[in-house]
Amino acid sequence: MVESHLTDNKYIRYFCYVMLFELFLLGSGQDLPLAGGLTLRWLNFFIGVGASVYMFVRSDDFPKSILAFILVYTAQLLIGWMLAFVFDSEMAYLMVDFKPLLYFYIVLFFYYMMTSELMIKRVVDILLLCVKIMTVLYLIYMTLTDVLGLFSMTGENYHSVDDSGSFMFRGVGSSLFYKGFVYLPIGALGFFWRKQYVWMALSILAIYFTYTRGLYVLLAFGLLAFYLKTHEVNIFKIVGLMLVVLLLYEVAEVLEIFQFDDTYLENREESDSVRLITIDQVFDRITWWSLLVGHGFGQGVPERPAHMEISYLDIFHHQGLFGLAFWVALFIAILKYGNSVVGKFKEEAAFFMTAAMMIFLQSCFNPYINNSIGMSITLLAFVICYRLSQDEYFTSRSTV
């Protein structure tokens, strides 16, 4: 059966929309438990993977590049598991490290769904709708609390509001940080691309009221990178811009530039100290073999037994240079495929390529690339840029 017949199934399409809506709006995905620890996100994942296996068996389309990434990724996970058993990792910590990484296998489902111009447009539509919802709700919340003072919701810095840790007080007035807020700068970029400047301004205002330096940097980088890419600037210069932005961020941290006003007094000393201690403990435990393949899942450090703040540090500790090389290769593949798209779909490729770069950049500070929040937009960028670069596979025919 040809692939287009499979994606013509309206129920599969509607399921895909529900999955994307949940991914973009519900942050970590832990706030909608169904039964026995199963959440809506993981239910969607299992359905999506099952559908993708069915599509793979019935379709005559075999994406060799994507399958190669899946095989290498699987090899990584197997090595991580073997090392975990060699070093007798605690099962609880092992699963905490391993479970989020499974979400990578949704990539094949995304591939088989992104088969038309309008399907890709729907992804952007759903993303921007979710950003609008987050923007409006957060601005209403901040207006009622800090602006009008009708009620107050204050807490200590980085104090979790809920059990899942999806919401945290910032320590500045009633401001909150929500894990899904990483999509606010990406949404602002989408509004800029689509010339929806009112929504762009509102989303930027919401970003301001998060009092989160990383989101400010992400917003500035995303807008500048997208502008440069759509104005024929070489992609290597944009990657260089990523490194410059990262350097400037660190300089700003040292000079306390973000603390020129009481509004920006985030009191990040404790959080920064945890990062530095974690880095030191990770490097203290490097051996010749861990340098290559890591210590395996479930092997943390005293400061962070699981889930290190910096994604790349977490990947390096558990999977070594082999693990980091995989994500570097994926990053290069996204740039390669996205940069090869010319003509009609150039701006679509530029948007998703920039969104992926924003996630890769933010993962220098927070754990995004190695969980479903960041992995989803990165895999969508990979698949969509791959699709758009393959003229023989992509069609503008609507299946929506």
Residue ranges and their predicted role:
Residues 352-360, 368-400:
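Transmembrane alpha-helices of multi-pass inner-membrane enzymes
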Residues 42-43, 68-78, 89-113, 126-131, ...:
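Aromatic-anchored transmembrane helix interface
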Residues 304-340, 361:
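A conserved mid-to-late transmembrane alpha helix and its immediate loop/hinge
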Residues 124-152, 170-228:
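Alpha-helical transmembrane segments of multi-pass inner-membrane proteins
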